[in-house]
Amino acid sequence: MVLSQRQREELNKAIADYLRSNGYESALEAFQKEAEMPGEIEKKYTGLLEKKWTSVIRLQKKVMDLEAKLAEAEKEFQSGGPNKKERSPSEWIPRPPARYSLSGHRSPITRVLFHPVYSVMVSASEDATIKIWDYETGDFERTLKGHTDAVQDVSFDQQGKLLASCSADMTIKLWDFQTFENIKTMHGHDHNVSSVHFMPNGDFLISASRDKTIKMWELATGYCVKTFTGHREWVRTVRVNQDGSLLASCSNDQTVRVWVVANKECKAELREHEHVVECIAWAPESCNGHVSEVMGAEKKGRSGPFLLSGSRDKTIKMWDISTGVCIMTLVGHDNWVRGVVWHPGGKYIISASDDKTIRVWDYKNKRCQKTLEAHQHFCTSIDFHRSAPYVITGSVDQTVKVWECR
């Protein structure tokens, strides 16, 4: 590409200004001599080279985003896929490219979670902090500091007034989400606390740890009121069902256990995974009809509860908890499955994996409908907003990404 005489002169002046402002005096002298330039450079050239440089990078990013969107649209057009107007919100799925890629953490992201009410989300990291972001604008809001080691999991109560976090520092912290103050710290586990989840009534909290136990905590006092024992290895994740009567846990012992909260009885031990089970998710009621359909006419009357589990054996399994039977196994990821969520519309499952992708599964037909190249490194966590069309992911690449669904 050939520059005009005027463009060449402007470029020379911008380069001269850059050399002068960065103190490269001898280079500037030589450059001005070679380029036969006057000694004085007008003010309008101050910082011009940097401005041009950053605007080129910005434009390049926009071009790449538009190219990705165009490629996506062409693919959909060729496959005769419906557009957003024709597709109902219950069928919207995350589409590339990511709407935002948010940086700020200094270590891998361990967990991402939407706030149940406000348009914010939180991310937990091995850098011992929790960060709060606005997922609609991509703005960073604040950092919560208090843990002294990796933050492993976070959970909101149903109103979103309280946030609980747990850490490798062996503590659980309770944060007031209005003032962002740490209002309680709970001690009792003997090792890394890997998971935390509020009970639906908001009065109690459940935690799981590398010490092989699950504990129930009373928020008013901060005391441990129940301990569930039975897992033979590190308990990775614990999640409570919608009415708070059951809790599910998964472990390095390759099992998923379901417990009756009232009497601590282990109702089911699910043992078909062949490696560490990393993540679990209870089916919301919106999914029960779809799952019953998949199970066939003779079992249609059954209303669950149903549970998903994701494992280092690279599979996702769906379980009928009333019978302890594995309904299906979804195969497709090329590495550990680290996160799994139900689509609020009930038809899909979305998963995140160490193969750096997120996958959308049409479980009725037992097939992977879409694969998104999500991150530069392992994808460690995923969440789907209950009512807004957004998915968020976190990664070892230290970024949080926001994906729009359509």
UniProtKB/Swiss-Prot annotation:
GO MF annotations in UniProt: dynein complex binding; microtubule plus-end binding
Span list, region Disordered: 74-99
Chain coiled-coil ranges: 54-81
Family: Belongs to the WD repeat LIS1/nudF family.
Free-text comment about domains: Dimerization mediated by the LisH domain may be required to activate dynein.
Function as written in the Swiss-Prot or TrEMBL entry: Positively regulates the activity of the minus-end directed microtubule motor protein dynein. May enhance dynein-mediated microtubule sliding by targeting dynein to the microtubule plus end. Required for several dynein- and microtubule-dependent processes.
Protein name: Lissencephaly-1 homolog
Origin species: Branchiostoma floridae
